[in-house]
Amino acid sequence: MKKIIVIGAGIAGLAAAIRLRAKGHDVLVIEQANGPGGKLREAKQDQFRFDLGPSLFTLPELVKEVLSEGNLSPSSFPYEQLDRSCHYFWEDGTELIAYHDKDKLAEEIDKKIGINASDKTNSEDVLTHLKHSAFLYDYTAELFMHRSLHKFKSYLSKPVLKALFKVHRFDLGKSLHEANKARFKDPKLVQLFDRYATYNGSDPYRAPGVLNIIPHLEHNIGTFFPKEGMYQITKSIYERAKALGVEFKFNTSCKQIVVKGNQVQGVELDTEFIPADLVVSNADVFPTYRNLLKNQKAPEKTLQSEPSSSAIIFYWGVKGSFPKLHLHNILFSDDYQGEFKALFDGDQLHPDPTVYINITSKLKKDDAPKGHENWFVMINAPANSGQDWDKWIPQARENILNKIQRTLGTDLRDKIIVEDILDPTLIEKRTSSHMGALYGTSSNNRMAAFLRHPNFSQNLKGLYFCGGSVHPGGGIPLCLLSAKILDELITNA
């Protein structure tokens, strides 16, 4: 059995530590923050509780799988399936609830969006699209989500070979927007399904059409909510790791990954050197090379790839109750293409942003005092390249409040009694995410999946990677899968 050091206690690092410890390895996790979770943490202020990071929970079986690793009984992890994925709002007064039940969804679409002039109704277009999304998932998930793209034998499996005969249906030659525009007659539905590019911080007008795999997770499989909030994912996995004997060092920064020849030797901290047979970096791949492997050859093409979008998040304790809203809510921009041009071409904020509002107190009542709600309010932002955020954030706040007033008919200004803010510079500072990018690199390239850093070093023996900046990508499910891929690579090495 080997001595393994994991750098970073984000969700992928925790999952990797559990899987490797369950194989009998000695595992030490080193984390610069004062606790586990990375972006998936919580904060409390004046009787309000906020999940600070990822707010959408899909594929809960991936969490349950991690919590079943090792020779202990599976850990308890209560969660519920939701009857809807999101409430959508447009400024013209259109409101749409995306029900999980397909019959209710079809009825809602035809009632709220209306009947189009073609032979098919809008709901038929959506249901056909969701079947296509399921098709994409069935034929591409095995390779793009569950296997290393950087090992030749991954391409020799039966599911992958089978997928090659269907590749002409993957919309690889179209952008996500082009694929959706060809499928839907109504521009609101195009916009709704274009939104899924933002799930990995990308631009739907440039990202490949194969990203239409994403709606399958939300609409066909379903959306879920942990009974104790999203931070319960971190807490449960962390407690499982400790129970299995994983060791942790918090408030500890790594100075460098020590290499001799082409073999990893361990990790140097401020005060000591810790030897290891293997090192796993759950840190962002950019600072891993620039800060921890300064004397080693870096994969410059990967490191110079376009970063994903970042975010500005306002955590608001709000007085009052808002029945129109649910757990997940989207207020769409009237200029969606302009919003993405500003983000990716201009490195700027758009004056009419799409606003995402997450309110966990809708389901977890003790997240806010009686008569109040906890609002997690997010807009997409460009990655940090030195913009004047101190100037931009007050402008963004005002744009968001104006958007809420125009779309929901509510002036929130005198109802906000608690406020905290997260911006790209703070994201970068707290999580070492390069430029504050939420998902590492964007998918604004038809070959983006193949340009992500692999889960292993191609030059250094004993060095592995997991987390949102490497294959298969960002977000809770893909981070958990990166840990699974890494575990299989180490086991089969």
Model-identified regions with their sequence ranges:
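N-terminal FAD cofactor-binding segment of flavoenzymes
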Residues: 43, 50-85
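C-terminal segments that line or cap access tunnels to active or ligand-binding sites in enzymes
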Residues: 319-428
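Glycine-rich FAD pyrophosphate-binding loop
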Residues: 22-45
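Helical element adjacent to the flavin cofactor pocket in flavoenzyme catalytic cores
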Residues: 213-264
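Rossmann-like flavin
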Residues: 92-207
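N-terminal Rossmann-like FAD-binding beta1-loop-alpha1 element of flavoenzymes
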Residues: 3-29
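A glycine-rich dinucleotide-binding beta-alpha-beta segment and adjacent secondary-structure elements
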Residues: 186-200, 352-356, 410-472
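Mid-domain catalytic core of redox enzymes
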Residues: 255-369
